[in-house]
Amino acid sequence: GRVVKDDTWPICYAKHSNAVVPKEHHLHEECGVFGVFSEACADVASLDYYGLFALQHRGQESAGIVVNDDGVFTAYCDEGLVNDVFPKERLQKLGTGNIVVGHVRYATTGSDRKRNAQPIVINHHKGRMALAHNGNLTNSYELRNELEQSGSIFHTTTDSEVIAYIIVQERLRTPSIEEAVYEAMGRIEGA
């Protein structure tokens, strides 16, 4: 076959049955993130479970869910498939809330150890935060070094924890979490 070099490669591929799709256009499984916000307190953990189950093809190394019930976080993460990590009894123990975020992991950075399961929960001077991330930072190494030199202690080998600490640093300087996230995005590179 011949290599198709076109920004509209799916269309070109369909037109040329002997075309070879460039490797950078192949599908890659790189984690899955699913979240729910509800105006009222609800069983958001079950909703998140089904969302993660649907995304499980994107990551089968670990799964995690964090439920926020008016600022009280209940979290559970472990290695394994969604249905193994969250049998009915464990899902019920997460309780109800109005915000939930979940993550299925496929290691692209860091190892596939349990400690790298997400979402990550961070306690800081102005509150708590749960973060789940799907992607890779291109300046993770530099940011991690900068953060460690300023006193941050890392518990994982993921670049997701780098993002969390950058957001926390910005949160200490800004009046809202939204502004902190906005400022943090200016410091990180990648996806």
Where are the regions a protein language model picked out?
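Extreme N-terminal basic, low-complexity initiation segments
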Residues: 2-5
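Conserved short alpha-helical segments that host acidic/polar catalytic motifs at enzyme active sites
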Residues: 7-191
